[in-house]
């Protein structure tokens, strides 16, 4: 049974590229202070799952992450897991100083199944990433996830996959503040420090709901074989009503 875990929310150095993760940018968008990057909130919520399920989840598990309300940098966040009857685990991010909770929810499963078929849409240029530094095993430690498996075994942290998808959004779809709202992440193999991966992203939907949103299918492959696949949603233009 996964156990609760508490961490202090923080933003990493690379997140200042999105103004919403700075106090000034967040206030300009109507928030009281800097929003923590959703991918870092995801990193926290994976902690109870990996502590309980280990590398099996990193190899073939996955889950759906939904961001319901902002997590503000500097706050204490409780990651509270519950087990469902079907074997899934739901982990909620709780900020005890806020009246509305949970702030975010991860529903994790031990077997996420095979890679889904790629859908038609607007294909973005392929990219290649080296899984090290900001996209390597150390992501969790920098964010506050203290599980030893990543540094000890050079296993890439699961938050790297939505972090890569976020980089695709940041550099390919937006020009100002934007917000990551949802991801479905499926793991298909372990990745380790220094691996090179090719990333193929397709914009499969655009719609307006509290801003202009984009939904991407993202395939992250090593030597032609998927390591992770994602359905990744973000508000890419906050100025659209």
Where are the regions that the model predicts?
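HotDog/MaoC-like acyl-thioester-processing domains
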Residues: 1-7, 67-131, 190-241
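Hot-dog-fold acyl-thioester-processing enzymes
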Residues: 1-60, 113-182, 241
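Short structured motifs
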Residues: 62-67, 182-188
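General structural concept
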Residues: 60-61, 73
């Amino acid at each position: 049974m996964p156990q609760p875990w508490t961490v202090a929310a923080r933003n990493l150095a690379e997140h200042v590229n999105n103004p919403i993760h700075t106090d000034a940018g967040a206030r300009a968008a109507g928030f009281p202070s800097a929003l923590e990057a959703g991918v870092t909130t995801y990193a926290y919520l994976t902690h109870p799952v990996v502590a309980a399920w280990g590398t099996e989840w990193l190899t073939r598990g996955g889950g759906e992450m939904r961001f319901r309300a902002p997590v503000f940098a500097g706050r204490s966040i409780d990651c509270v897991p519950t087990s469902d009857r079907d074997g899934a685990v739901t982990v909620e991010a709780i900020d005890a100083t806020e009246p509305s909770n949970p702030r975010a929810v991860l529903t994790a499963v031990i077997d996420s199944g095979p890679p889904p078929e790629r859908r038609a849409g607007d294909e973005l240029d392929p990219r290649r990433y080296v899984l090290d530094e900001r996209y390597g095993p150390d992501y969790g430690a920098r964010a506050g996830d203290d599980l030893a498996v990543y540094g000890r075994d050079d296993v890439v942290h699961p938050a790297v996959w939505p972090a890569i998808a976020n980089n695709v959004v940041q550099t390919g779809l937006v020009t100002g503040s934007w917000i990551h709202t949802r991801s479905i992440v499926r793991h298909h193999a372990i990745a380790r420090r220094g691996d090179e991966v090719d990333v193929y992203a397709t914009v499969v939907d655009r719609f307006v709901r509290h801003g202009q949103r984009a939904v991407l299918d993202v395939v992250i492959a090593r030597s032609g074989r998927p390591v992770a696949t994602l359905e990744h949603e973000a508000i890419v233009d906050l100025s659209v009503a």
